């Protein structure tokens, strides 16, 4: 059942008024593939626009806080923690992990996914002058904790 549709099939924001406040957490990731020279430029700190990872981290945090303004049926949330980590993966990728937490009545999956996505887009924006062929991939929810649906963890490749 799609919870964002009413009985007539119209889009609406889910009413969470009666839901209990519980601890909730979600982790998402995105991967940016690029030329090895682009990754080296980022790692060497030689990018003319500045520290690519620092700017992408701040962009991801900011995006998580503004998810409800970007995705129409998301609730505005009082996030208690947003962490965005970026890891260079030689020879040609950056892996972004975003984790969002709160005590609330609805989950934070969209906030984590938005944080990872916008951090990836920021890397693209900062590096497009030297590498227009970058690829953003594997935007996905890795783990979700809390709420009525319980615990979800993406299975590793090759697991049943």
UniProtKB/Swiss-Prot annotation:
Q: Which NCBIfam families match?
A: moaC, PRK09364.1
Q: Is the keyword Nucleotide-binding in the record?
A: no
As its record notes, the protein acts as a catalyst of: (8S)-3',8-cyclo-7,8-dihydroguanosine 5'-triphosphate = cyclic pyranopterin phosphate + diphosphate
**CDD domains named among the record's database cross-references:** MoaC_PE
Q: What does this protein do?
A: Catalyzes the conversion of (8S)-3',8-cyclo-7,8-dihydroguanosine 5'-triphosphate to cyclic pyranopterin monophosphate (cPMP).
Residues annotated as binding substrate: 73-75, 110-111
Residues at the catalytic site: 125
Name of this protein:
Cyclic pyranopterin monophosphate synthase
Q: Name one GO molecular function term.
A: cyclic pyranopterin monophosphate synthase activity
Q: Matching InterPro entries, A to Z? A: MoaC, MoaC_bact/euk, MoaC_sf, MoCo_biosynth_MoaA/MoaC, Mopterin_CF_biosynth-C_dom
Q: Name one Pfam family in it.
A: MoaC
Quaternary structure note: Homohexamer; trimer of dimers.
Which keywords are on file for this protein?
Lyase, Molybdenum cofactor biosynthesis
Q: Name one GO biological process term.
A: Mo-molybdopterin cofactor biosynthetic process
Enzyme nomenclature, EC number: 4.6.1.17
């Amino acid at each position: 059942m799609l919870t964002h549709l009413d009985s007539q099939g119209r889009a609406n924001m889910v009413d969470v008024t009666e839901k209990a406040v519980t601890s909730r957490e979600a982790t998402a990731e995105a991967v940016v593939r690029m030329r090895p020279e682009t990754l080296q430029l980022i790692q060497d700190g030689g990018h003319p626009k500045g520290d690519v990872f620092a700017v992408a981290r701040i962009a991801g945090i900011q995006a998580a806080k503004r998810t409800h303004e970007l995705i129409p049926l998301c609730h505005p949330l009082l996030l208690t923690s947003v962490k965005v980590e970026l890891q260079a993966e030689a020879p040609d990728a950056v892996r972004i992990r975003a984790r969002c937490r709160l005590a609330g009545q609805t989950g934070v999956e969209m906030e984590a996914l938005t944080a990872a996505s916008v951090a990836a887009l920021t890397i693209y924006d900062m590096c497009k002058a030297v590498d227009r062929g970058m690829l953003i991939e594997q935007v996905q929810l890795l783990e979700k904790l809390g709420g009525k649906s319980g615990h979800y963890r993406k299975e590793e490749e090759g697991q049943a």
